[in-house]
Each structure stands twice: as structure tokens, then as C-alpha cells.
Curated annotation (Swiss-Prot):
Residues 47-74 form a coiled coil. Belongs to the GreA/GreB family. This is Transcription elongation factor GreA. It comes from the Bacteria. Necessary for efficient RNA polymerase transcription elongation past template-encoded arresting sites. The arresting sites in DNA have the property of trapping a certain fraction of elongating RNA polymerases that pass through, resulting in locked ternary complexes. Cleavage of the nascent transcript by cleavage factors such as GreA or GreB allows the resumption of elongation from the new 3'terminus. GreA releases sequences of 2 to 3 nucleotides. It comes from Rhodopseudomonas palustris (strain TIE-1).
Length: 158
């Protein structure tokens, strides 16, 4: 059985956009670079040709990876979720119990996780510690950087 990948609708759209760009913009551009480099003659010592072939290999690998993830996507419409328990798709406001600093994280699938955008993977130590907890609860997260304690201030569905 094929393992489904949980993904938000926006995460699915972002991966679809990347796939379309790689197929319709990057692929033709790389093929053009290969043809141009090939026209320069001897391929054995043609650095431009080898660089273009390497770029092609990288691009095709990413296309295959994106096609696989999109085919296995289990799209979850976060706007239809509710409740005060943390689960996939929840946006959670945390307060660091040591520093009192607030942090807001949305729990998403691995393919769409991006800490800079406030999105953490459901498989991350923080998300695993939060799943099933409610607002007002305290959690301890054991991560590579050491243990941290947080209070769950709010659970939202955006």
C-alpha cells in the first residue's frame, strides 16, 4: 500500500507550482544550455556541457520527487478543522516557560515544512510533543539543542 503524505491545500499548491515551473521553464532552459554547450565541440573536456548535464540530472530528480509527493498527497483542508486539541494543520501559539517569548507554529507535512515561514513538520520533535495537547497545557520538548518547556497559549485553525 502506498503511504499517503498529509499536506495542507496551500502546501499542495506550492509543490504543484514548483513542479510546473521545473517542467515548463527550467527543463527547456537546461535543454537549450546542453544543446549550446554540445555545439562547442569535444564533450570530454567541455565543462559547460557537464555542468548543464548535472543541472539536468538535479532538475529531473526533483521533478520525480515532486510528482511522487503530489501523487501520494492526502490534502487536508485546515479551514474545516476545529477544536482545542493540537493536531495536523493547527496553528499553535507557544510561550517559552524560561524566556516568556511567544512563538507561533503551524503543524504541516514534511514536504511543506519551513521554519522561516512558521511551519514545522508533523514529524519534528516539537510537533510530536504538541500533538494531542490542549491550550493551557505545558509540554517539554527534547530536541538536539536540549530540553525546552513551553506553555500552549492558543490553538487555532487558519
Amino acid at each position: 500500500m502506498v503511504e499517503k503524505i498529509p499536506m495542507t491545500a496551500s502546501g499542495y499548491a506550492a509543490l504543484s507550482d514548483e513542479l510546473k515551473h521545473r517542467q515548463s521553464v527550467d527543463r527547456p532552459r537546461i535543454i537549450e544550455h546542453i544543446a549550446e554547450a554540445r555545439s562547442h565541440g569535444d564533450l570530454s573536456e567541455n565543462a559547460e556541457y557537464h555542468a548543464a548535464k548535472e543541472e539536468q540530472s538535479h532538475n529531473e530528480g526533483r521533478i520525480n520527487e515532486l510528482e511522487d509527493k503530489l501523487a501520494r498527497a492526502d490534502i487536508i483542508d485546515v479551514s474545516k478543522l476545529s477544536g482545542d486539541t493540537v493536531k495536523f494543520g493547527a496553528t499553535v501559539t507557544l510561550i517559552d516557560e524560561d524566556t516568556e517569548k511567544k512563538a507561533v507554529w503551524q503543524i504541516v507535512g514534511e514536504a511543506e515544512a519551513d521554519a522561516k515561514k512558521g511551519k514545522i513538520s508533523i514529524t519534528s520533535p516539537l510537533a510530536r510533543a504538541l500533538i494531542g495537547k490542549k491550550a493551557g497545557s505545558s509540554v517539554e520538548v527534547v530536541a538536539p539543542g536540549g530540553a525546552k518547556a513551553y506553555e500552549i497559549a492558543k490553538v487555532e485553525w487558519r
